[in-house]
UniProtKB/Swiss-Prot annotation:
<dbReference type="GO" id="GO:0005506">
    <property type="term" value="F:iron ion binding"/>
</dbReference>
<comment type="function">
    <text>Together with an NADPH cytochrome P450 the enzyme system catalyzes the terminal hydroxylation as the first step in the assimilation of alkanes and fatty acids.</text>
</comment>
<dbReference type="InterPro" id="IPR017972">
    <property type="entry name" value="Cyt_P450_CS"/>
</dbReference>
<keyword id="KW-0408">Iron</keyword>
<dbReference type="GO" id="GO:0020037">
    <property type="term" value="F:heme binding"/>
</dbReference>
<feature type="binding site" description="axial binding residue">
    <location>
        <position position="458"/>
    </location>
    <ligand>
        <name>heme</name>
    </ligand>
</feature>
<dbReference type="Pfam" id="PF00067">
    <property type="entry name" value="p450"/>
</dbReference>
<dbReference type="InterPro" id="IPR002974">
    <property type="entry name" value="Cyt_P450_E_CYP52_ascomycetes"/>
</dbReference>
<keyword id="KW-0479">Metal-binding</keyword>
<dbReference type="GO" id="GO:0016020">
    <property type="term" value="C:membrane"/>
</dbReference>
<protein>
    <recommendedName>
        <fullName>Cytochrome P450 52C2</fullName>
        <ecNumber>1.14.14.-</ecNumber>
    </recommendedName>
</protein>
<dbReference type="InterPro" id="IPR002402">
    <property type="entry name" value="Cyt_P450_E_grp-II"/>
</dbReference>
<dbReference type="GO" id="GO:0016712">
    <property type="term" value="F:oxidoreductase activity, acting on paired donors, with incorporation or reduction of molecular oxygen, reduced flavin or flavoprotein as one donor, and incorporation of one atom of oxygen"/>
</dbReference>
<comment type="similarity">
    <text>Belongs to the cytochrome P450 family.</text>
</comment>
<keyword id="KW-0503">Monooxygenase</keyword>
<dbReference type="InterPro" id="IPR036396">
    <property type="entry name" value="Cyt_P450_sf"/>
</dbReference>
<dbReference type="InterPro" id="IPR047146">
    <property type="entry name" value="Cyt_P450_E_CYP52_fungi"/>
</dbReference>
Length: 510
């Protein structure tokens, strides 16, 4: 027994010594410099307990984690720092070059998406956002053609939902005064996303007007799906924060919500896999995402996992973008006036709104990009080191030297802080100024990554931008004036899977 323990201790010492020598060799080879460290104020902070619980509280209750990280970077006068978390060591960096390195195809083997698969698996299974390696590659190959440009061009399918949205806004404005656009944008995006994905809408907007669903699906199943959508996402956000302790987030409400999500999607999946190839081809003429996917596989679980993954991403990011865009427009009358003039000239009627005319409207793109810069829909990106590796910047007093990232370290990239760097985005980076994009590259430059970058970059990027553009154009076409009814300008942001306005987006149109 003693001999075995002695051998184990010796082996551990040898392993740790070899690891130390290897890391020192890496640091010397790449001229690495140390990263600034969050000062330890207690035993708890040394173990990571205080940072972990403070971060969780900030994210799930106060919505201030994005600001907290920015303030920490500013107070340390750095672009990168290291801290202890309950789940291990964490590096926070707002260096765009580090983000691009982590996400590049050349370094994919150096990094994993951490505990994300474990956290998201109850809802998304092995879908594209919760898988890695060969499983992820297969998902990517299968889904990429469905997001081809010619399919995104079919934007006229949005108009029926746009008419419902406009009717609700007009009705609410006439009867109740200010209207909260945030839940309406979430209703619009889930209606359109479900139509695009399944060929049938959730009909949330229609029910908002007192109408009834005309589809073959049980109306209560639709209502259940839409009503628990946000609750399930909030649970998943907490699971991602907890990392290896994600199993602690488990309740009857959570599992009931998952069941309702799966039940909704299963209805459409079973309908698709029961079709013959000839029937699928016939149904695909109107372009339904599910039917395109079912041509490649009839595996019910694969279809369900991928559909829920796309729905989760597509609905939230676009609704968040629209909510914050109109919040900013309602507080910047000069921007609304300019956008109104541009839209009236470029899009005289509904028929003039095409994929090509949207792509050619620079000022509209500036407004969308500026909203994504100031209020990124997904405020964080992260990776976990799969082995000892190097990031190109963040070390030393001037943060210009490479840094060593140890195996198991989590690297967090806060877009909220990165997007507020004057050296990349010009003067007054805290302010909403669409005109700044006149002097920036058309794609935003290497520091602008609202949809991530590299092989895992969002497949639905163009789809989301076209959808947000269409909604914006139609509302600007319909109304001449926009006025804010928010009590204060600085938006209070709630960070979950995406960011939301804590106090909503209360406006009035004329």
């Amino acid at each position: 027994m003693i001999d075995a323990l002695y051998i184990l201790i010796v082996a551990l010492v040898i392993y740790k010594t070899a690891q130390f020598v290897h890391r020192k060799s890496l640091e010397k080879k790449h001229h690495c410099q140390p990263v600034k460290q969050i000062p330890l104020v207690s035993i708890l902070s040394g173990l990571g307990f205080d940072m972990f619980f403070k971060d969780t509280a900030e994210m799930t209750k106060n919505g201030g984690l994005h600001k907290k990280l920015q303030q920490m970077l500013e107070s340390l006068q750095t672009t990168t720092f290291r801290s202890r978390m309950l789940t291990g060591s964490q590096i926070v960096t707002m260096e765009p070059e580090n983000e691009r390195t982590m996400c590049s195809s050349a370094h994919m083997k150096d990094w994993t998406i951490g505990y994300r698969p474990f956290a998201l698996k109850p809802l998304l299974g092995d879908g594209i956002f919760s898988s890695e390696g060969e499983s992820w590659k297969h998902s990517r190959i299968m889904l990429r053609p469905i997001f081809a440009k010619e399919h995104i061009k079919q934007i006229t399918a949005m108009e029926p939902y746009m008419l419902l949205l406009i009717e609700i806004i007009k009705s609410s404005s006439a009867n109740e005064g200010p209207v909260d656009l945030q839940p309406l944008f979430h209703a619009f995006t889930i209606d359109y996303a479900s139509d695009f994905l399944f060929g049938e809408s959730c009909d949330v907007l229609k029910e908002n007007l007192g109408g009834k669903s005309t589809s073959g699906m049980d109306a209560q199943v639709k209502r259940d799906f839409a009503s628990v959508f946000n609750d399930v996402q909030n649970y998943l956000t907490k699971r991602m924060m907890l990392g290896p302790l994600a199993f602690l987030v488990s309740s009857k409400d959570f599992h009931d919500g998952i069941k309702k999500q799966h039940e909704f999607v299963s209805y459409f999946v079973q309908k698709a896999i029961s079709m013959s190839d000839e029937e699928l081809n016939d149904e695909s003429k109107n372009y339904v995402f599910l039917y395109q996917l079912a041509k490649q596989t009839k595996d019910a679980k694969v279809l369900q996992d991928e559909l829920l993954s796309i729905l989760l991403a597509g609905r939230n990011t676009t609704a968040s973008l629209l909510s914050f865009l109109f919040f900013e427009l309602s507080h910047h009358e000069n921007v609304w006036t300019t956008l109104k003039e541009v839209v009236d000239q470029s899009f005289p009627d509904v028929e003039s709104i095409t994929f090509e005319t949207i792509q050619n409207c620079d000022y509209l793109r500036w407004c969308l990009f500026e909203s994504l810069r100031v209020n990124p829909s997904v405020p964080f990106n992260s990776r976990t080191a799969n082995k000892d590796t190097i990031l190109p910047r963040g070390g030393g007093e001037d943060c210009s030297h490479p840094i060593l990232v140890k195996k198991g370290d989590q690297v967090l990239f806060p877009l909220y802080a990165s997007n507020r760097q004057e050296k990349y985005f010009g003067r007054k980076p805290e302010e909403f100024i669409p005109e700044r994009w006149r002097d920036l590259p058309k794609t935003g430059g290497p520091a602008f990554m609202p949809f991530s970058t590299g092989p895992r970059m969002c497949l639905g990027q163009q789809f989301a931008l076209i959808e947000a553009s269409y909604v914006t154009i139609r509302l600007v076409q319909t109304f001449s004036k926009l006025k804010s009814h928010s009590l204060e300008y600085a938006p209070k942001r709630l960070v979950a899977a995406t960011i939301r306005l804590i106090d909503g987006c209360f406006v009035s149109f004329e």
